[in-house]
Structure formats: structure tokens, C-alpha cells
Amino acid sequence: MSRAFRAAARGASLLTYYFDLAWRSCRRSKALTALVVLLMGCGAATCMVSFAVFRAAAADPIPWKSQQLFVPQIDNFGPAHNWKGEPPTLLSYTDAVALLQARQARRQVLIYGSKWTVLPGDAQHLPSSQEGDAVSHDFFAMFDAPFRYGGGWSASDDEQRAAVVVISSALNRKLFGGANSVGREIELDAHAYRIVGVLDDWNPSPRFFDVSSTWYPFSRPRQLYVPFSRAIDLHKAASTNFYCSTNSVDPYLPNWDSILHSECAWIAAWVELPRRADVERYRDWLHNYAAEQQRVGRFDWPPNVRLSGVGQWLQIMKVVPKSSALSLIVSVSFLLICLVNVVGLMLARFMRRAPEIGVRRALGASRGAIYRQFLTEAAAIGLAGGVLGLLLTALGMVGIGKVFEPEIARLATLDASLLLLTVLVAVTASLVAALYPTWRAAQVQPAWQLKSNG
Amino acid sequence: MQIRPILAALRRHKMATLLIVLQIALTLAAVSNALFIVKTRVLHLSRPSGTDEAHLVAIRNEWIGQPDARHIDAQMRADLATLRNLPGVRDAFASQAYPLQEGGGGLVRIKHRVEQTTKAQLALSYLADEHAIDTFGITLVAGRNFRADEIGSLGPYDKVAPAVIIITRDLAHKLFPDDVAVGQRVYLSDDGPSTIIGVVDRLQGSYAGSSTRSIDEDTVLVPARYASSDDGASYAGGTVYLVRAQPGQLAAVLRAAPAALVAQNRMRVINPEDGMVTLAQARTKAYATDRGVAIMMGAMCLLLLLATAGGIVGLSSFWVGQRRRSIGVRRALGATRGDILRYFQAENALIVGAGVVLGAALGIAANLSLMAHYELPRMPLWLLGVGALLLWLLGQLAVLGPARRAAAVPPVEATRSV
């Protein structure tokens, strides 16, 4: 037998011995052990459930491309009407169209949301109301929207205000039973539209691209997309965010033309800037555009523009609900309090066994052996807590919709990494909690314990 | 009871004492804040909407194909006549939102004068007609109801400037703290004054969330029908029909109403999933997360208290075990069982007292930092007092077992050694 093997075998048998000791001690103080396991399990589970929700809400919806997508903002409200110096989160029609026509980015997209009534061909079915976005043609390429059938429309369709539409797979199932419907017509708001594409199941979470206008980053998926220019021509009003000032009454807008020429903000814009140099160049262009507006007298304030990436934009839009951040804070503090309690309980547990430690030390066990023994015990308790935590986390994921917004709770998933993390958190927390009690246990003097009464 | 020997004994167990103090402090801070959040949530979800919720149903109706205002207005009148004539229906009216909804009401800014530069009074509005008060089941406490000829028609580009309005008592108090509101004129827009003709006792706005908490009871009834399929500056496209059923007839009305409307005219959309909700359903849905948070916080509190009690039991019994000899000595020197019992109780009271002081400070700090980041009011001090009392009682209860065991140590223990 090699030395290394013998050492390993001895280590393994010692570990079994430590586990055996831990098991005996747990049986001796059942209530205390149960309480520690319960605390660790509950602490870890609440943390994991809130973390799962937080992770779902704070996810990057388009990780492969989020570094290249940006939202431009132009302050057309001015210091008297903007929000603490920040430009509006949407663009006016004037600025949106100027940005689209300038073509300073690789791709540029305008978006606003509206509701459409879909009339079925036959009289048996009842009409339905569907939410959709009016977008310019670069939309599908910019956000890598996957198509099941067909594709997006072209730049010339945009220019000709073509009556074309891209529908979601859900709407395609509802209207055509999931068959390839490209080339067929549907009636929206009593106008005929030709279907050019059917999207695959596509619902980025959060739905970042129209978050500034729709307010619903986790629910109400868009069912159809029509050309922006066509929607404007049809006087299709925005069913989404529309505001003209952050602090005063909206101006009088007697007709569609006055809406288009107003300084009200209601159109979301995105630009695709692949390289870092492009971003700087675009920033300069935005600044110059605002400076030009000031020069011609439209703005009487210096340029106030922003260009934000996806992550930054989701932060500005406060996509992660405050409640989910709050519950993460609450549950982490809960775990910490549990930890403090566990330190106390472990201290009582370990110190009660001072006589046993004294005897083991007197029989030749080193300090290191005592450390190993008690940390093994802590890890074992942590493991038990972790298993309980797993059960509670799984249970929590079922009831999650009762505590968090159901739309977000739906996105929180129990995957392997979360399971592993639960056990890891419980074991690590138990080990940390056991550090001080173990240190105290290792300080027990063999002679003193043997002399005095145990 | 002597404090000095207790302190001397505790000095030998600095870390263990500190741990219990910390445990008590953290528990008090966490439990008081959690209970406070539960209290605000429960308060929030038990607010009455002021309406006859048990018999009300809201039907969201959308128009198809951008019909013009005249057509929509005529259709709405026809729909209302159909609904009011349905068996089991007490009354009905058309609005754009309903109570306990998550948003959808028009926000209005009310000014006393057009040229007013101070901040306008914010309020939430419902479009209404002369049937609104009876349908909601609210009571007029002053003034009169709308007349049929006062109900206007609003288009998407129109400004809201009705000649007459009815407001809630809460809003009346805010607008005219020392005056009678009925007969006064206010401005909902710069286009013209609106005369307050009536005051109703209570009617909650359409936002069930907490974002509009301060103006939830400040509601304006605007006498108009919104006749557009488009979303306007203030109102979402479509119509909400509010229908009040006769007692016991709600189920029948729920079945009959959408069918009757479709039979009247097919060119409409009533979403089969969420187009029709009773106010009871709306309340359950709107406050589901509030209830969940309250339950979760309550469970956490219970567990924390349990853990703290367990910690006290654990450390106290450990101490008792460690001090058996000194207890024996004290007993041998003439201390009674009661003396020993009281010693451990006093020790616990002292430790919990220190923890409570620290915990109160931590709890207030936590409340202040929560207030800075979240919409949470200041925590009342009595709640900390209740928490402190609870922990103190819990401590006494937890220490009782170990202390009794300590009191049971016989004096002869003093003479024993290994």
C-alpha cells in the first residue's frame, strides 16, 4: 500500500468518524439541531426564491447584442418641463423622424405601441383586440427577431407606406391554426394587410425594446407589427405612453397634425452601433443635432442629449421592480439574522461538549483534529439545511406568484445552478457560523476539563 | 436582586452575551419593521372602495374599425338601454375605468383659478352619467345628481372641461377646507370652469396599487361619454360598462350581459379572458401580492422569534450546566431556590433589555433607510414598544426552563468534583 493511499484511507475513515460524532451529537440535542437545520433551510430558501425572481427581472434580454444597441434621448422639453434635468424617455415625432432619416447608425428603429382590432374572415368568430407595435423596417434585423415563416418588410415598403404586417406565432395559431400564412390577408381596424412574416415564439424578458412606451416589460406580448409610416398615415394613435411635460397640463391638441408637430414625447427610438468609435460619433451627432435645433430657435436651451446602452436603459426605466429588489434585501438580512442565531446555537451546542473535547484532547487529539471534527459537524448540519432549503425553494417557486408580480414570478425558474447555489449557500453559511464556536471549542484545555466537574 | 454579580458573571462570557444581545437587537429591528410592513399592507388591502362591490361587474368593450364619435355615442346609448333592461340588472352606466383596477383612470389637475401658479390639486376621474351614483351604490351627501341633459360627449382630442362635476367628500375637504364645496367653481382645464353640484361620501379611484395612495379617495365624476375607439390624451380607447346587479342576480347578469351586447351589435370586442370582471375578482387580483407579502413577512417573523427563543434556551441551559458548581455553592451558603430562579431571570431581563435598546435604534435606522428608497411611512414608536415587550416576554419564557433546572441543583453539588 502506498503512503498516499494509506493517508487517504486514514483521512476517509477519520471523516467517517467525524460524521459519526456529528450524528451522535445531533441525536443528543435533537431540538437544537432541528432548529439550526430549520433556520439554515428557511434562510437559504427565502434568499434563493427572491434571488430567482430578481435574476429573472434583471436579466439581459439580448446578451449577444446588448453592447451594440443604444437608446438616444433628446431634451425637447427644456429645463422648465423636464424631469430634474433628464430628457424625456421618448422622442417627439419631429426628432424621431429626423433621427430615422439621418441614417447615422448602422440601423435605426422607431417604435410606438397601439391596439388593433382583428376582424376574422367568417361571421362565426368574434373580432378580437390585439396589441402591436408600429415599427420601422430595421426592427426585425436589429433585435434578431426569429421568423418561422417569411420575414420582415423592406425599406421601400416603409417608404410606400405598404399595408403589410408581421404577426406573432400566437396570433398565427389563433387565426390560421399555425399554418404558413405568409401572403394571406388579415383585416386590421377595417383595413386589409398582407402578412409578410410570422415570428417564432419570441418574447424577450424584459421586453426591452418598447419598455419606455408600454410600461409592461414582462407582460402583454406584442401580437403584430405594422410599418411605422403606415400607422402614422392612418392617424393610428399611440395606446402607450404619451406625455408633453413632466409638470404641467398637456397642451391642446385638436387633431392628428397637431400631435405630429407637438413637442410631446411618444416614440421610442433605438440605434445599432457596432463599434465603440460609432458610439462616440453618434453621441457627437446627437449633440450637434440638438445644437442645430437651438440655433434655429426650436430649443432655447443648450443641447441635452443621452445615449444609453441596454443595461443602462433598463435601469433608467426601473424595469427591476422595487419590490423584488426589496425582497432580496429583506431575505438576505433574514439569512444574516438566522446566521447570528445559528452562531449562538452552535456555541451552546459545542461548549456543552467541553468535557468530551477535554477527554479527546487528553487522549491526544490535536487542535486541528478538533477543528476538523466540529467544522465537519457544521458542514453536515449545513448540508441538511441545504436539503431542507431545496425542498422549501421548490415549494417557494410554486407559491411565488402569490408574493411577487405574477408576470415576473412566471419567469423565475428553478434550474440546476439555483439548486446548487441553495446547497452552497446553506453549507457556506453554516461553516461561517461555526467558525467562532469551533475556535472556542479548540481552546478547551485538556487538563482543566479533567480537573473540574463536567 | 443584585445586578453586580450578574454583570461579573456575564463578563466571563463576553462573546455569548454579545451574541444574545445582537440576536435580540436584530430580531427586534427585523420583526418591528416586518410587522409594520404587514400592517401597512393589510391596511392598504382592506380599504373600502366605497362601492357596492358584491354586486358590481365591469365590462370592457372595444370598438372596431375606428367608427366616428357620433356612431359610438349612439351605440353607447343603445348598449346602456340594453343593459338597463336586462333582467336582474339594477342600473348601469358607461365609464372608462372601474375601482380596484390597476390603472386606467384619468388623472385630472384641479385649479381654483386659471392663472393659479401654485400646484394644482391632483385627483382621479371617472366618466359618469346620471345613473353613476346609483350604479356604484354610493351616497350623495350634499348637492344634487347629474341631469340627463348635462352628459356630454368627449372625443380623443377634446379637453376635459365639463360645466358641472360631482366630487368626493375627501376631495371637497382638500379643495375647500373651510367652505362648502357645492356651488363652487374649479378648473379641470383652462377652457372653462366646472361647478361642483354634488358631493358623494366615498369613492376610490381606479388605481389599486399604492402609487396614487395620497389621492385614492379624491375622485371626480365627469358627466360625459368617451366616444372614440382611439386612446385620447386622458382616456384609453373603448368603454367600460359598469353594471350593478340586483341582490342574488350577479351570476345571471354575468351570463346575459355580454351576449346581449353582442346581439345588439357584433362590431365590438369583449375579451373573453379579461373583458368582464366582477369587482370582487378585481379586488382579489389587485391585492394578491399584498396578501402574499403579508403572509411571507408574518412567517419570517414567527421563525425569527422561534430562533431567538431557541438561542436563549440553548445558551442559558449551557450556562446553567457550566455553573452547576457555583449554584451549588450559593445554595449551600443559604440561597433559596427562588433566589437562583430570580438570578437567571434577572440575567435574562438584563440581556434582553440591552438587546432591546440596541434593536430599537437599529429598527428606526432600518425604517429610515427603507423610507428613503421605498414608499413607506414612518414607523410608529409604539410598534417598537410592542416588539420590545414581546421579546422581553419571550426571553422570560425561554429562560424559565433552564432557570428551573438551575434552581433544582442541590446544595450538595458544591462538594462534588471529578
What are these regions (language model features)?
Chain A
Residues 138-152, 163-317:
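Mid-to-C-terminal secondary-structure elements
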Residues 26, 350-353, 359-368, 444, ...:
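Short helix-to-coil transition segments within interhelical loops
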Residues 1-19, 24, 28, 32, ...:
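Membrane-helix entry/capping segments
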Residues 51, 330-357, 370, 437:
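A hydrophobic alpha-helix feature that marks transmembrane segments and, especially
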Residues 34, 340, 356-401, 421, ...:
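Transmembrane alpha-helical interface segments in multi-pass membrane proteins
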Residues 2-4, 8, 51-175, 179, ...:
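Structured, solvent-exposed hinge/loop segments at the ends of secondary-structure elements
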Residues 28-62:
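Short, strongly hydrophobic transmembrane alpha-helices
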Residues 421-454:
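C-terminal membrane-exit region of the final transmembrane helix in multipass inner-membrane proteins
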